Amino acid sequence: MPGPNPPIEPPVEPAIDPAAYRAVAGRFATGVVVVTARAGGLDHAMTANSFTSVSLDPLLVLFCPEKISRLHAAVLEAGRWGVSVLGEEHEEVSRFFATRGREVSDRLDSWSCHRGPRTGVALLDDAIATLECRTHAVHDGGDHSIVVGEVIGVDLRRPEARPLLYYAGGYRGLDRPPGGE
């Protein structure tokens, strides 16, 4: 009588090349926002395309800041943050807030902003829309955190405006084809 069959070992998965992963992930078009928080008496801001709606009941959204970013620390400290949805004319704004290494005080002085009535955070005056959020939960996401916020204020400022999109490593508008910078 033959003995029991040896266990079948699952195949070893080859490592995924980070460049290949980025190329694939970059084929998912996203909107572009600027996320802001105020902590230690200073405004903090960064461009994000990792922003999405999560739930309607309760009203929840999320974004994913890099754990080493100043905004990450500010959001954790303040517990309140804002989102300014960028229009297709805001590519310069997006690039400005995406630049690493700038002093915090230089980030918002160049753009017209107002304070959110519920959070006191800076929100861009000419954003398509703004949201004010209170941190609901923070989850580990590798080198980023997944910050879930309860939406406590919204303002649809320019409903006719067209959104700024990010796709395949570049900015797009609804009418601009890939490669049509």
What would you call each of these model-derived segments?
Residues 1-181:
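Basic, polyanion-binding surface patches
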